[in-house]
A protein has these predicted regions:
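The substrate-binding groove and active-site-proximal loops of carbohydrate-active enzymes
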Residues: 79-90, 114-131, 165-181, 205-222, ...
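Aromatic-rich peripheral "rim/lid" segments of glycoside hydrolase catalytic domains that contact
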Residues: 182, 349-408, 414-426
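Catalytic-core region of carbohydrate-active enzymes that cleave or remodel glycosidic bonds
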Residues: 226-241, 262-267, 271, 281-354, ...
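Extracellular ligand-binding/catalytic regions of CAZymes and related secreted enzymes
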Residues: 378-394, 432-433, 471, 598, ...
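Carbohydrate-binding surface patches
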Residues: 404-456, 461-466, 501-504, 518-520, ...
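Helical hinge/lid and interdomain linker segments adjacent to catalytic or ligand-binding clefts
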Residues: 454-543, 688, 713-728, 732-737
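A glycine-rich, often tryptophan-bearing local segment used as a flexible ligand/cofactor-contacting loop or short
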Residues: 506-590, 596-602
């Protein structure tokens, strides 16, 4: 389950290849046909259940029997046998797990196809492994829980990696023979289960790059591997959607990020473990910023062009109270639903049994023992109860004709971040060149050099993007992440928080120079553009766009903005104060010289700090200080009223942008699944206090009702608004119709 970020907390310097000994030596020289110890039983009931209907994607949601639905469940690692369940096969115990999952409202379960068990020797497939999977398929039909198999599993829990014994040090994402064998095994899965309706989708693997080669995997390797494995499956299987179970690849700028694999898969996954990304989420587990993690990662991945599913999410009750874990997951499940998640698959179904504590990987990673929504002996923890209510609630949603509402704000993602490393297609070069272009920043293009990493620049970009995303939500606006060469001009507002406006060798953090020509045309045509700049900022043609230009750097350790003109709910004399996190050009602000712009606020030295400009049919707002960067590193910054969102709200009002639905409480996120005449408003309270919320709409809504696990309850409207009570880190789904 642990991704690269998580493993930095717990893994040892040596990879535990010796753990393969638990699986593989037992296979050598052994008859792999069924024996009494591995016998695959049939489900206990003699009454056949109805078969699960086939599932497909319609581009927005999963569909079965012609109706959209949200598959919800968790990852299954048995409590007693853990990752050794194929060799410690216990059909009765496994069926008891499926019965419990059915009781909790599971409609999907993700599970591991251990590579060393399915392919003990190169190209030699274990019939027992497939017979065991057949048994799991039969349980899926009986208990009406779709299977979501994850292929090529070596690692899943802690730092452990159960390797195939015949790899012999070869890179599984790069070695030609390994790629051939992996593609062939994928084809074998496709051949066996091409028409099996109990499988909801194939997951190519969990949290790639494979942990044993994580730091050695390039963009090209990830792209080629995904392409080949998908081709292997598609040789026989044309039915099932395909996903790669990635974790943190977008926020960490990993090689398996959504933009790299988009041409080959049907959907994306996110594993929003915010507690293991403290650089982005310097907060308590149960916090405002932390509970925006799922929605943020979903929006970031959606920008690459496919729907997104929450694959793994949660926290361990060995580290946090069960009640806080339940509230954390609850808020993120509903927030993710509003962001457009097409399913939820938590980590994980059960705690580990106490006997597992005495051996690796649980021996070395105590926190791994308590991630379940149930205890090891199938008793409900608070998360199980919250999950069951969530399952019952979303099962009542009619998603026909609905889609996540379009964003009001586009936070543009630089092409240098999105494109595969080594792609020169947007370099402005045409035709053949007698003297080839070579960039020293492309690293591996130089003999003997590896693909460079720019983790600091990526952190700078992601933290500011996350901050802008939350500020937009608090201002009642939806933000998404169109790519630099994408359709960003379709949004009424475009936001460019620093470092998107920066310059420098870490190109992935900022847009290309010619972007600003397009931005000016966008504004002239009626768009609304906000930007913040730091001392590292560089904007060609800045004066013509913002009515002001950079004249120098503005070093300092503290910044105070004082409003000198009314702006939104700001009055002259109002102030905002910020601490500058580092003495660097990434944190210092800028001295700007105003031409046509209007000064709205000045800094502590009376210099222009916020300026507005009108250009053609559109408007711009410029901050001379990187406000989003200032907030990004402050622990728990959103767990108390944070006034910076008022700047976003003021720009919204000045631009005349109105969201379809809006809350009067900045801490209550409002998102929408929207249709022509009906839809759902998802309200999530990201605070530790109960909120009595007034929700207003600009639509001619006639009826609203709250959708709950036990049914829908009408809500009385007052004109075009209504009031609703939402508990701390809780949520409400409100159905509306015109």
């Amino acid at each position: 389950m642990l991704d690269t970020l998580r493993r930095t907390f717990i893994r040892s310097q040596a990879v535990l290849l010796l753990l393969a000994m638990q699986f593989v030596p037992a296979l050598e020289g052994r008859d792999l046909s069924l024996d009494p110890q591995t016998e695959v039983a049939q489900p206990s009931s003699k009454t056949p259940a109805s078969r699960l209907p086939e599932v497909h994607l319609d581009g927005t949601y999963f569909v079965r029997n012609g109706k959209r639905f949200l598959p919800v469940g968790a990852h299954w690692v048995p409590a007693k046998a853990a990752m050794e369940w194929p060799t410690e096969w216990d059909p009765k115990d496994i069926e008891a797990d499926f019965a419990k999952m059915h009781e909790l409202g599971f409609s999907i379960v993700r599970l591991d196809m251990l590579w060393a068990w399915f392919e003990p020797r190169p190209g030699d497939y274990n019939p027992t492994a497939f017979q065991q999977l057949d048994y799991l398929v039969s349980l899926a039909h009986k208990y009406q829980i779709y299977l979501h198999p994850s292929l090529f599993i070596g690692g899943e829990v802690g730092e452990a990696w159960w390797d195939v014994p015949w790899r012999l040090g070869r890179h599984p994402h790069a070695d030609a023979d390994m790629l051939r064998l992996e593609s062939n095994l994928a084809a074998e899965f496709g051949r066996h289960y091409a028409n099996e309706s109990a499988i909801v989708a194939w997951d190519l693997t969990d949290e790639p790059p494979f942990w044993i080669v994580g730091d050695q995997t390039t963009d090209a390797m990830a792209i080629n591997w995904t392409h080949l494995i998908v081709d292997g499956l598609r040789k026989y299987d044309k039915l099932h959607p395909i996903v790669v179970g990635t974790s943190g690849q977008e926020i960490d700028h990993g090689p398996f990020r959504a933009d790299d694999i988009s041409p080959f898969v049907d959907l994306f996954s996110v594993h929003p473990f915010t507690l293991y990304a403290p650089d982005l989420f310097p907060d308590a587990l149960l916090s405002a910023r932390g509970t925006y993690g799922a929605a943020f990662e979903i929006a970031l991945s959606q920008g690459a062009g496919h729907p997104v599913m929450i694959h793994e999410m949660g926290a361990s009750t060995a580290q946090f109270s069960p009640e806080r874990v339940a509230a954390y997951d609850r808020a993120q499940m509903y927030s993710g639903l509003g962001a457009g998640s097409i399913g939820v698959d938590l980590w994980c179904y059960t705690d580990a049994a106490p006997e597992q504590f005495h051996k690796v990987p649980y021996l070395r990673t105590p926190q791994e023992t308590g991630w379940g929504m149930t205890t090891w002996d199938r008793q409900d923890k608070p998360l199980a109860r919250e999950f069951k209510k969530f399952s019952q609630t979303v099962s009542r949603l009619d998603l026909t004709g609905l889609a996540p509402a379009p964003a009001e704000i586009g936070i543009v993602i630089p092409d240098e971040w999105a494109k595969p490393h080594g792609d020169f297609s947007h370099f402005g070069l045409t035709g053949p060149a007698s003297i080839p272009y070579l960039s020293t920043q492309d690293g591996d293009a130089m003999p003997g050099q590896r693909q460079p990493t720019f983790s600091n620049a990526n952190q700078w970009l992601m933290s500011s993007a996350l901050t802008a995303f939350i500020l937009a939500r608090q201002a009642g606006l939806k933000a998404d992440f169109p790519r630099e060469y994408g359709d960003w001009a379709k949004r009424p507002m475009l936001f460019m928080p620093s470092p998107i406006t920066s310059t420098g060798d870490a190109f992935l953090a900022h847009v290309h120079s010619d972007f600003y020509e397009k931005a000016r045309k966008y504004v002239e045509s009626g768009g609304f553009l906000y930007a913040s700049v730091a001392s590292d900022g560089a904007i060609p043609g800045m004066a013509s766009l913002f009515g002001a230009r950079i004249v120098d750097r503005a070093p300092g350790s503290e910044v105070t903005l004082k409003f000198v003109e009314p702006f939104g709910d700001f009055k002259p004399g109002d102030t905002l104060h910020y601490s500058v996190p580092t003495a660097s050009i990434e944190s210092w602000g800028t001295l700007i010289e105003v031409s046509s712009a209007k000064v709205i606020a000045v800094d502590q030295d009376g210099r222009p700090a916020l300026v507005t400009n009108t250009l053609g049919k559109g408007k711009t707002l410029l901050s001379a200080y990187p406000l989003e960067h200032y907030l990004a590193s402050i622990p728990a910054v959103f767990d108390q009223p944070e006034p910076t969102q008022r700047i976003y709200a003021a720009f919204r009002d000045w631009a005349g942008i109105k969201a379809a639905f809006q809350s009067d409480q900045p801490s209550v996120e409002v998102s929408e699944l929207q249709g022509d005449h009906r839809g759902y408003v998802i309200l999530v309270n990201h605070s530790a206090s109960a909120q009595n919320v007034t929700v207003s709409t600009i639509l001619p809504v006639r009826n609203v009702s709250r959708v709950q696990a036990d049914g829908s309850k009408p809500i009385e409207m007052e004109g075009r608004s209504w009031r609703i009570q939402i508990d701390p880190f809780d949520a409400a789904i409100v159905e509306w119709s015109k």
